């Protein structure tokens, strides 16, 4: 992919991000999600039928066939467009939702729009746009948020929080004072759902408390233990990780979910960050998530084809179904306690 330069710094960086994410060094090396330590029941007499297990879920007012979103990954270059269309096709076929990668490049370079245009292949999926919190401290406002949603015909917008990534990025945006007020201000001007998400270092309790009185529809905890975007940035900049201790910072996914459910008991939560199997998903749902989001494990299949991405997701969903079945559940709602 590095042999396909775009001539634009942002787009070139997006391609390098993809390359870096495929490297094992992009993953947390010491910190784990904590999901392995979440107890899961095993029932030798489950008293249910596997094939009748109900997984359908309503999220942001849309019905999904399973509580699964394709997480935010990429956009802004030709290769990214292929990935996004393959993922959207898989989401369409399976009745899932999808988050786009950061659309800043699309707003600043309109010809990058095509790489985010997935409605041609998936006209009816739940589609979530994406902009960075830092951009709202640098002149972005409700107008740019509306463009990010309207120009790709999305249903909602995720605003991603990535201070550690920005701090370790060459030329990163690190002026964040006043950002909490600014995000609430912008969200109040919008007439579509706004989601707050981390990028893989976790939403902490203090941040959730600070956002609690804002008009946010959901929170993606994006916990530590999967892809470290701090590591990704250092791999892009230096070819290796120069600050390994800093790159291990974050709130592990299981801890982030527990804190979020305690801090915002009525909020809709997305669990992401190191979700690698259907059992991970089941455990995350048991901690209070409404849906889970998966990104990194889908990157290689999506580079191959929509069929490969769909096959990975089918297996993931079947793992979730089996976990619920042997756990004694008959419906995904039961695992959440509702």
Curated annotation (Swiss-Prot):
Its main location: cytoplasm. The keyword Flavoprotein applies. InterPro entries: Aldolase_TIM, FMN-dep_DH, IPdP_isomerase. One of its GO terms (molecular function) is FMN binding. Its EC number is 5.3.3.2. Belongs to the IPP isomerase type 2 family. Homooctamer. Dimer of tetramers. NCBIfam families: IPP_isom_2. This is Isopentenyl-diphosphate delta-isomerase. The lineage of its organism: Bacteria, Thermotogati, Deinococcota, Deinococci, Deinococcales.
């Amino acid at each position: 992919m590095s042999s396909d330069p775009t001539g634009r710094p942002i787009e070139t960086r997006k391609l390098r991000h993809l390359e870096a994410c495929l490297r094992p060094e992009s993953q947390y090396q010491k910190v784990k999600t904590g999901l392995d330590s979440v107890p899961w029941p095993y029932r030798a007499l489950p008293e249910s039928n596997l094939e009748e297990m109900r997984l359908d879920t309503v999220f942001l007012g849309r019905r999904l066939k399973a509580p699964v979103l394709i997480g935010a990954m990429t956009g802004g270059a030709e290769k990214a467009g292929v990935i996004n269309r393959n993922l959207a096709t898989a989401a369409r076929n399976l009745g899932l939702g999808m988050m786009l990668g950061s659309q800043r490049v699309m707003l600043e370079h309109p010809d990058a729009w095509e790489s985010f245009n997935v409605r041609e292949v998936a006209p009816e999926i739940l589609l979530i746009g994406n902009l960075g919190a830092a951009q709202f401290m640098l002149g972005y406002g409700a107008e740019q948020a509306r463009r990010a949603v309207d120009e790709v015909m999305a249903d909602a917008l995720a605003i991603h929080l990535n201070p550690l990534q920005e701090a370790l990025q060459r030329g990163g945006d690190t002026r964040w004072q006043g950002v909490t007020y600014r995000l609430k201000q912008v969200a109040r001007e919008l007439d579509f759902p706004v989601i707050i998400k981390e990028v893989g270092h976790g939403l902490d309790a203090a941040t959730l408390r600070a956002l609690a009185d804002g008009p946010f529809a959901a929170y993606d905890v994006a916990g530590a233990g999967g892809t470290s975007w701090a590591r990704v940035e250092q791999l892009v900049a230096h070819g290796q990780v120069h600050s390994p201790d800093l790159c291990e910072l974050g709130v592990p996914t299981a801890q982030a979910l527990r804190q979020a459910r305690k801090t915002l008991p009525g909020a809709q939560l997305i669990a992401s960050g190191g979700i690698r199997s259907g059992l991970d998903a089941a455990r995350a749902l048991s901690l209070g998530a409404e849906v889970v989001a998966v990104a990194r494990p889908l990157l290689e299949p999506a580079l191959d084809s929509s069929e490969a991405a769909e096959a990975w997701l089918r297996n993931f969903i079947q793992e979730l179904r089996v976990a619920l079945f042997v756990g004694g559940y008959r419906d995904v709602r039961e695992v959440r306690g509702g």
